[in-house]
Amino acid sequence: MIWEVTKLRISMILSAIAILVLGFALIYGILGYFFGFSNAPLLITGALAFVTIFTILQWLFGPALIKSIYHLTEVDPTDPQYGWVYNLVQEVAMYNRMNTPKVYIANVPFPNAFAFESPIYGKNMAITLPLLRMLTPEEVKAVIGHEIGHLRHKDTELLLAVGLIPTLLYWIGYGLWWGGLLGGGGGGRNDNSGILFLIGIALIAFSFLFNLFVLFLNRMREAYADVNSAITVPNGAKNLQTALAKIVLSTDPDIIERYKKKYGQIGSMLLFSGFQINEDIPAYKVQELVEYWRNIKVSPFADIFSDHPHPAKRIQLLEKLTHTQ
């Protein structure tokens, strides 16, 4: 287990560094070539300041938008109906040696759980009503352990920082595209408006490529949150496996057969998702799907466009961790 956790942590750190270094190197090279390498740092600083301001505003006030979209209602320990949910979050927070975040119930018609934070709104966790009805309390604790992991690991801040790179590439590319479209200007290399136009398009394309790198980092972040649940919550690995299976089965009760007929076809790679849900799921189907995920070989590219790992990859990682509990 120690090696699995260490390998995942090192991979996340190296991936984040690689995205930042390669991104800034590409931006510096392009701007330096067209506007002079002495001017490139100033241009990068200006563009970075512009993008960072909007990113910080999103970070600071994003929780207010989340609360509105998900119709969140805060829960406290004395709540006669959902006080037990607060107690579960408090218990898992204690396992993780952190203060209990604010707990919310989300009145939306699909199973989901998520954590979010900002300096203004603090640490928060929300669980939707269908998820609470679908899972056992032990499975809910495992899900909470996953979400607490996101808070512990400062995942919001990590993604905002790394996400600056594709955003910078896009807006600089967009600016060069317009510069080329309007005829360049400024003398020297900048007279070649056609090159500016093409480089702008190339940078926009690179921004989408770097978004794939960010998705790769995000999948590791999700796996690391799974690990957090497995190592901090009693029986967290086993319970998170069955929770994931229940949530997937709730979107399509016959999904096992669909897996067998056409590999990899699943409506969503999100851990907690679905809209047409079935909350009454037979235990044998849960175990059958978990067993299926444990034994299939997943293509490295099965989740390349997803921000979550393929469910089978998650189950197989959690299965390794069950032997340590």
From Swiss-Prot:
Zn(2+) binds at residues 146, 150, 222. CDD domains: M48B_HtpX_like. Binds 1 zinc ion per subunit. Its EC number is 3.4.24.-. One of its GO terms (biological process) is proteolysis. One of its GO terms (molecular function) is zinc ion binding. It comes from the Archaea. Its cofactor is Zn(2+). It is a multi-pass membrane protein. The active site is at 147. Keywords: Cell membrane, Hydrolase, Membrane, Metal-binding, Metalloprotease, Protease, Transmembrane, Transmembrane helix, Zinc. InterPro entries: HtpX_protease, Pept_M48_protease_HtpX, Peptidase_M48. GO terms for cellular component: plasma membrane. It is found in: Cell membrane. The chain crosses the membrane at residues 17-37, 42-62, 158-178, 195-215. It is an enzyme of class 3 (hydrolase). PANTHER family: PROTEASE HTPX, PROTEASE HTPX HOMOLOG. HAMAP family: Pept_M48_protease_HtpX (MF_00188). Belongs to the peptidase M48B family. This is Protease HtpX homolog 2. It comes from Sulfurisphaera tokodaii (strain DSM 16993 / JCM 10545 / NBRC 100140 / 7) (Sulfolobus tokodaii). The gene is htpX2.
